[in-house]
Amino acid sequence: MPLLDSFTVDHTRMNAPAVRVAKHMSTPKGDAITVFDLRFCAPNKDILSERGIHTLEHLFAGFMRDHLNGSDVEIIDISPMGCRTGFYMSLIGEPSERQVADAWLASMEDVLKVVEQSEIPELNEYQCGTYQMHSLEQAQDIARNIIAAGVSVNRNDDLKLSDEILGQL
């Protein structure tokens, strides 16, 4: 099985909260696609709550589009990581890590402005596979933690696992 890019970086050295360019690709027509690792918490040290990350999934996707989409950037998808330490964001374009970090922080401010659980988008059995598994309070706790900590940048060169280590795993 091929080694996926996300498993060639040392998760024990990742900072969080932090933005990392996980991958650059181009479509056959030459459009740039960038995949970002939006690491909310340090791998193997902390984990986002099940209800909190699910609520963030519903809120974050729209808020990030509000703050980052423009003439040269269009978000394709924002999805939670299976390990529950963050989200992957795929987009058309090549915004800087700082632009992404600023949009992320602005989105967390937006999460804090949501007053009631009923304001969570697509919170119904027709549009959500587990619509009762949400917590606005937990999502807002996560948002407060991100704002308080600030968002840094993780660089692949700083996190790259050596061929020797990869060979031992």
UniProtKB/Swiss-Prot annotation:
- InterPro entries associated with the record: LuxS_sf (IPR037005), Metalloenz_LuxS/M16 (IPR011249), S-ribosylhomocysteinase (IPR003815)
User: Per the database entry, which stretches of residues form a coiled coil?
Assistant: none
- State the free-text cofactor note: Binds 1 Fe cation per subunit.
* Keyword Iron applies: yes
Cofactor(s) named in the record: Fe cation
- Record's SUPFAM superfamilies? LuxS/MPP-like metallohydrolase
List the Pfam families.
LuxS
What are its GO biological-process terms? quorum sensing
The record's annotation in Gene3D superfamilies points to: S-ribosylhomocysteinase (LuxS)
Q: Transferase: is it a keyword of this entry?
A: no
**Which E.C. number(s) belong to this protein?**
4.4.1.21
Keywords of the record: Autoinducer synthesis, Iron, Lyase, Metal-binding, Quorum sensing
Superkingdom, taxonomy of origin: Bacteria
Question: Residues that bind Fe cation, according to the entry?
Answer: H54, H58, C128
- Molecular function GO labels: iron ion binding; S-ribosylhomocysteine lyase activity
**Reaction(s) catalysed by this chain's protein:** S-(5-deoxy-D-ribos-5-yl)-L-homocysteine = (S)-4,5-dihydroxypentane-2,3-dione + L-homocysteine
Family matches, as NCBIfam families: PRK02260.1-2
Describe, as the record does, how this protein assembles with itself and its partners.
Homodimer.
Job of this protein: Involved in the synthesis of autoinducer 2 (AI-2) which is secreted by bacteria and is used to communicate both the cell density and the metabolic potential of the environment. The regulation of gene expression in response to changes in cell density is called quorum sensing. Catalyzes the transformation of S-ribosylhomocysteine (RHC) to homocysteine (HC) and 4,5-dihydroxy-2,3-pentadione (DPD).
The UniProt similarity line reads: Belongs to the LuxS family.
For this entry, the protein name equals: S-ribosylhomocysteine lyase
Q: Report the source organism.
A: Shewanella sp. (strain MR-7)
